[in-house]
Amino acid sequence: MDHKLSLGLAMLPLVPAVQAQEQGRQDGERPNIIFIMSDDHAQQAMSIYGHPIGKVAPTPNIDRIGQEGAVFWNNYCCNSISGPSRAAILTGKHSHKNGFMKNWALGFDGSQQTLPKLLQQGGYETAVIGKWHLISKPTGFDHWMILNDQGEYCNPQFITEGDTTIHKGYVTDLITQYCEEWMDNGRDKNKPFFLMMHHKAIHRNWVPAERHYRLYEHAKFPLPDNYYDAYEGRYAAQMQKMNIYRDMYEGHDLKMVAG
């Protein structure tokens, strides 16, 4: 593909896009914009931030996006829950203002102003492909193809305007493939485009692609200093740890089978 792109990843997207738009105004040409979102992606897992994990599992393509654009070092997420976080990104408003404050709410109010709607008004063709998780159907998009609810890692269901079908394959590969197909053949190439590529990964419960099962078989990941914390003299912290173990499915994440 030979696309002029302004790339963004999760919480790194808008500064490069704005810079590209400034250049576009100077040239009289509007840039294409791709917003790439991963799910529950820890900062420490991106090697551009310099965490020791990055030496074991480097992320060179993510790093390149930051090196060619901007990296945020002092920022926050206004809502860390899946659906509400997406609603905040779409609207630029906190959850109590956009009305979507928790998952499994009544549904996102798609009648309000959003980024894709503004770009449509500016002559952009818009699309969202991948995880949506806002219950109501997407608005402000010329094309949308979204996962059913959280989506599945293997053979996921995709929803389009009139159909829900199972697609054979691994979800990250499929979302990437469908985004490429839309950019190559599914859009009006006389218009600039705005594409939201919303990946399910790396949301728990983790299921890697089969080809990656042994990718880190011999790697040794550094443990944090408090990994074996006994919580001596800190009863409240100990109880909170027990709640995390019970409520956050650590056993399932570690592929532990109950006897």
Each language-model region and where it sits:
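Formylglycine-dependent sulfatase
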Residues: K4, G8-L9, V18-G259
